[in-house]
Design a protein with these regions (language model features):
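A structural signal for multi-pass alpha-helical bundles of membrane permease subunits
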Residues: 1-207
């Protein structure tokens, strides 16, 4: 709490980092400039929430699909090892992920450009140099790294569903779609909400 309150306190002053002892009070002037005079801030806010919404939506969908697959194969011998390999992107630091995809998306030497050129005949361009391709790239990279996190949460949720509900659904003749929509998804909504909150906090840090 103290760092947050101290940051709010400092925001009410005009100062240089090298001369903090000479700061002078300006009140809400910094906020006034930020909200009403800065053209970049609203765009940054819009882009941040657009990227967050898109990334989290993709992560929930893909995470649930992956969680469902691992839930169905949980009794197979090597399922735990496969799950461990799947969650490895979470362990990578943002710097490492950024450098890897910087090379992958390089328009001259990147493998992505090579595939687009040789397979689809699309001429390489600066994927991170144009607004729309850059946003799509960030969403894709963000989703790639954090979908396993959502998968682990939703898999934990699926593990909490009582076997009695599956047995009752089987007796009633419910198909896989009814089981998924009437039993599994309602049972893991709290896990989805937890994942959304945690990921939203992480995505806002992109700002």
């Amino acid at each position: 709490i103290f760092p947050f309150l101290y940051s709010v306190y400092l925001s009410l002053f005009q100062a240089k980092l090298t001369k903090m002892h000479k700061k002078f009070f300006i009140g809400w002037e910094n906020y006034q400039v930020l909200l009403f005079e800065d053209d970049v801030f609203p765009t940054a806010i819009k882009n941040t929430f657009m990227i967050a919404f898109s990334s989290i939506t993709i992560e929930i969908i893909l995470g649930f699909i992956m969680a469902k697959i691992f839930f169905e194969i949980r009794h197979i011998k090597f399922s735990n090892a496969l799950r461990t390999v799947t969650i490895m992107p979470i362990m990578l630091t943002p710097l490492c992920v950024g450098l890897v995809f910087l090379y992958i998306l390089n328009p001259t030497l990147g493998i992505f450009s090579y595939i687009l050129d040789t397979v689809f005949g699309i001429e390489p361009f600066a994927y991170l140099g144009e607004p729309l391709p850059a946003k799509i790239s960030i969403i894709a990279i963000n989703s790639w790294q954090w979908t396993p996190f959502m998968m682990i949460l939703l898999l934990a949720g699926l593990m909490t569903v009582p076997n009695e509900q599956y047995e009752a659904a089987k007796i009633d003749g419910a198909n896989w779609f009814h089981v998924m929509t009437k039993i599994e998804i309602p049972s893991i909504l709290s896990f989805v909400l937890l994942g959304v909150v945690l990921r939203l906090i992480e995505c806002i840090r992109l700002f």
